[in-house]
Amino acid sequence: GVSGITNIVGVFFVKEYLDLSAVFLAGLGFWAGLPWVLKMPLGHLVDILWKFKSLLVLLGAIVMATSSVIMFGLIQYKVQMLTILNAETWFVISTLLAPIGFVLQDVVADAMTVEAVPKIDENGNEINFNELKSMNVSMQLLGRVSIIFGTLLVSILNLIVFADSSEMTELEKVKAYGDIYLYSLIVPIISISGIFL
């Protein structure tokens, strides 16, 4: 749910600062959606590389953070960023990196939900099917509740930041856009903290 924190800013950024056609953006949307299409085979890869799940979460967090830092830099330090690549190229790189990081973490999280439900009780007895099913349903419910909570949190944050956007100066808008990308770094931080907790 928290992953959508930059969606609104991304739309405004494209509209106000980039000269990209609708056809180009549709094509970019296809490529950005490709990691989600590949989620199933990536899930199988995670099963094969299970002992490295922490590294996969870390890699996903680094990729997500890189995407956010690129956009923050492009918004707040545009002149310096444009000496390396043009704005459209930076935007494309950032747009393609974000879903790769999210999918990497999502497939690990999916696999971990199965592992999180115990198969045996504290006495070493196998848990009966109905109780096991109930625990799995509870685990899925908690996951969905956290997604809803994250989405609401992000919506409220965007409402607060952009409440007076029509009255903002250009400099204030740029700062607000950049701040949202900085706030989005909380997502990989949450992921990395999960490795150590």
How would you describe each model-predicted region?
Residues 15, 46-50, 162:
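Helix-capping/transition residues at the boundaries of transmembrane alpha-helices
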Residues 19, 50, 74-75:
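Helix-breaking motifs and short loop linkers at transmembrane-helix boundaries and internal kinks
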Residues 55-59, 180:
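Juxtamembrane helix-start motifs in multi-pass secondary transporters
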Residues 1-36, 97:
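Helix-loop boundary and gating motifs at the non-cytosolic
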Residues 1-2, 34, 38, 66, ...:
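Hydrophobic/aromatic residues within the transmembrane alpha-helices of Major Facilitator Superfamily
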Residues 25-49, 58-67, 152-155:
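Central cavity-lining transmembrane alpha-helices of secondary-active solute carriers
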Residues 66, 75-92, 96, 104-197:
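Intracellular loop-helix junctions on the cytosolic face of multi-pass helical membrane proteins
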